[in-house]
Amino acid sequence: MKWCGVLMVALLQSLCCSGLPLYQSELASTADKALVVTMTQVNNLYAGLRLYRVSRGSIKRVVPLGLNTYDLIMNFGIKETDCLKSSGEDPQRCAFRVGFFVPAASCTARVRVTAEFTQVVSLNCGQDSSSSESSSEENFTRKRQQLNVQPFGNRGPVLPVPGFSEATRFPSHSFSRQEVEPQPIPRGDSFGNHLE
């Protein structure tokens, strides 16, 4: 009866696990490989003139997907270095920039690691809360990059062209200057303050 209980516990534990477990030494080398790929992506996509380097990091979760296939969910911090992006240097060998307004960010990444390849599944970086550069949050997302373009931001008022009038442009129509009140269009997503 005792052997039956031990066998049952062993069977239940084996059914709960998928894939082979990562041991501490394997986890460290796998995480290093994932971090190198992630930092390459960060520096290719988001770095300005200078490279970023990891300042701190941790693995939040290991998700086994199959035999020797894992998703690592990592949290890490990055900070700008003295090395220029065009230098081709390894960012981990570069010194951090010193100063009060040095850009820093906190990042979360999901990296798929297999025996053949390492791939960044998702990457999200936001301005570090300890950075004093600004209080607004910047999000860098691999899936969706936002561009802040103001197409009419630099244009001034339209000046009339001499010798050109509305009457010459539309000769069959006469325009009288009337103030037209714009009609509000209900959007359907507003709420009233009364119950029906």
UniProtKB/Swiss-Prot annotation:
The keyword Disulfide bond applies. InterPro entries: Cystatin_sf, Spp-24. Multiply phosphorylated at serine residues. One of its GO terms (biological process) is bone remodeling. Residues 125-196 are annotated as: Disordered. The keyword Ribosomal protein does not apply. It holds the Pfam family Spp-24. Residues 129-138 have a biased composition (Low complexity). It comes from the Eukaryota. Its main location: secreted. One of its GO terms (cellular component) is extracellular region. It is found in: Secreted. Disulfide bonds join 83-94, 107-125. Keywords: Disulfide bond, Phosphoprotein, Secreted, Signal. Residues 1-19 form the signal peptide. This is Secreted phosphoprotein 24. It comes from Salmo salar. The lineage of its organism: Eukaryota, Metazoa, Chordata, Craniata, Vertebrata. The gene is spp2.
